[in-house]
Structures are given as structure tokens and as C-alpha cells.
Amino acid sequence: MNNIVIVGLQWGDEGKGKIVDYLSENADVVVRFQGGNNAGHTIVVDDEVYKLNLLPSAVLRPGKISIIGNGVALDPHALISEIESLKVKGVDVNYNNLMVSESCPLILSIHKDKEKLFEDLNGNHKIGTTNKGIGPCYEDKVGRRAIRLCDLENADELNKRVDILLNYHNAIRKGLNYQVVKKEEILKEIQEISEKILSYKKPVWKILNDLMKEGKKIIFEGAQGAFLDIDHGTYPFVTSSNTVASQAITGSGLSSNAYIIGVVKAYTTRVGNGPFPTEQKNEVGDSLFTIGKELGTVSNRRRRCGWFDAVLVRQAVQLSGVSSIVLTKLDVLNSFDTIKICTGYKYSGKMYDYLPASHSIQGELEPIYEEFPGWKENTQGKRSIETLPINLIKYIEGLEKLIGVPIHLISTSPKREDVIKLKDF
């Protein structure tokens, strides 16, 4: 099991960062393959809290190689800022342990401007983006006008790419009576960061293939979750990249068989707008929010909270070919008398065992629940299966039956070491 892909199976914020950090102890390389600094991974090591946005979670482990693949939308200023903030905490990030794909499309201020502009134009129909410029950057990539990291090396090529980029963006800005951007402004923005960011530029696809031939253990670290996937998520309330496991190949350049692990919370959360069948706009939701400290790592927005949705997770398992589940934040459920799991939906007299693609239907689905008795016992920080209450074990067994995949690990706190291995992978 040399290659592992780790993906979220809900709407992100499942705790992937901690799990990647935990598993990377026995890995050599960790690769980010999609998303950008709209992702937020929180890791607690020796009571020190680290919040990562672009950097792979293995950056906190000495001797590991961290790679940012071509599928990532790269904000160069954000990356350098994140590196420098870690150095203040004693974490050494350098061009020997961090490599960035030369093909990464760059996020510039013009992308953030466009995202905010169109969110404002959408009024009450906002997607609820992070305003980090991720979507507009991916638009430019698909439109073949993006500036890539490799373009920064050649002044003539860069000038040409900036002209192409501004022809598009300024046409839109003029049409909306928005101030146009001067070429000198974009060039200055890029030149401020070029020297620092280019020191990390590498042919990542080639390095990964060489590392695989050497027998190195590689973890691919997903961002967001399955139902934020641009194709398979709750469209249009999704992110602008593919978040399912197959994107690990496209977004890194390494084509190989991998063992796929899905990470889920013991309940469900979502940031921003969009359908959420099991959302609890009541005391249950308030309790999950308060106990789980459910604020977005990047946006600092309140996460919407609800019961575990086995229909969604089962669908995500199938979309990503998941073989194993890691269950996080079980300790948040300690105080509940009764815990519910969604096992199906009803809509207009019809039963559904999957999430329909239609946005108009998704927002009207009525969840069908199976109830489980709570365990009413403090499980935070527990590290052995023998110490777990019987009702918690029954809850885990119920989840396994409903989603059709074994749960191998559970997490009982944000701390790195608070993990219980239920089964061998």
C-alpha cells in the first residue's frame, strides 16, 4: 500500500488534515492535488495549533517531502506568507522539502476582484465563495489564458500571457463600468514574488514518478469534500475543482493504483449556501456548532450543522472508490441522548436512496432517520477501543452497515495522537 489517496466525503471540514498528518508518519511524500488556499486544514501538535491552507499537512513532519501538484490553483503571495508564518513557529520549509508544480495556474488580485464582483452581482443568489479567487483562476486555466508558474521565468512569455489575460478581464470590467487593470500593475504584483516562488518550481509529475519507482510511500491529500465537487456536488453550490479521488491522478501527474481512504465527521457540517438535507436549525444544530467549535478555518464563518447523512456518504464512497473510512469528531456527540442517521430521502411521494442532481429537488428532500441511543460518556482523548462505550460501538457498526465500507480509524480530539485504530488497513 505505497500510494494512498485521502478525500473528504461530505462538504469539507471532515478533519482530513489531522488524518493526513497522522498517516504521514509512515509515508515519505504528501501531495496536494486540487483546490487552493480556500482549503483549511487544522492540526494540533504538542498543544500548538497549525492552520494550513496551501501547504500539505506533512510539512509539519521533519524529513518528509511536500508537493503541490498542477491541479492546485496557486496564490503565490499566500503560499510565501504561509511558509513564513510556519518558520516563525520553528517549522523549516525550504526548496528541498517543498516542491511546487511548474504547471500550477497562478491566482492574482484580478481573480479576487472578479470573484467578489460576481458574488455581489448575484445578490440573494450568492454561492458563498471564500473570495480567494479560486474559481476565476480555474476559469482562466480552462480558457487557456492563465499565467502558470513556469511563465514567470521568461519575461517575453510573461508579457504575452499578461496581455492575453488582461484582454479578457478588462473587457468584462469595462462592460460592468469597473476600473480596468493596467499591465504594469499585474507585472509589478508578479515581480514582487517571482524570485521567492520560483525557488520551489519543479517538474512535479516527473519527480513523483521517480519517487514511485524508488518505492517511496506517497499520500495524496484532498481538499474540500465530495459534495463540493464541480461535477458530482450540489451544483451550483460547489467549488471549482474536482474533489473526488480520481482527481489525484490529473492534479499530480502520477498515474498509479492507490488505496483510497475517505474521511467523515460523525455528524455533518456545511459552510455557505446550498442544499443540506439533514441540517438542524434547532437546539441540536446549536449544540453541534458549540461543542464542535464549527467555524470555517479559512472563512471564519459559522458552519451549518446536522445529523450524519449515510445516503450522501455512501454515494461519495462509490464516486471515489473508497475502501476505508476514518471517522472524526465522535467526541462531539458525547452529550446526546439520541443520535440520528439519515438512511434515505422522500420527495413528492417518491423515495430516494441517492442524492438527485437537480438543485430544485435537493433543497426539498425530507430525510428519513434511524435512531441510535447516545452514550452519555466523555470519550475525548481516548486511545483504545476497550475504553469506548458500547453504544458508541453500536453507532459505528450502524454507520458501517449503512455506508457499506469498514471504519478503520476514529479520531477522539483534534490532537495528533488521539486516534484509535479499530482494524488494520
UniProtKB/Swiss-Prot annotation:
Binds 1 Mg(2+) ion per subunit. IMP binds at residues 13-16, 38-41, 130, 144, 224, 239, 301. Substrate binds at residues 297-303. It comes from the Bacteria. This is Adenylosuccinate synthetase. The keyword Nucleotide-binding applies. Plays an important role in the de novo pathway of purine nucleotide biosynthesis. Catalyzes the first committed step in the biosynthesis of AMP from IMP. Its EC number is 6.3.4.4. The gene is purA. Coiled coil: none annotated.
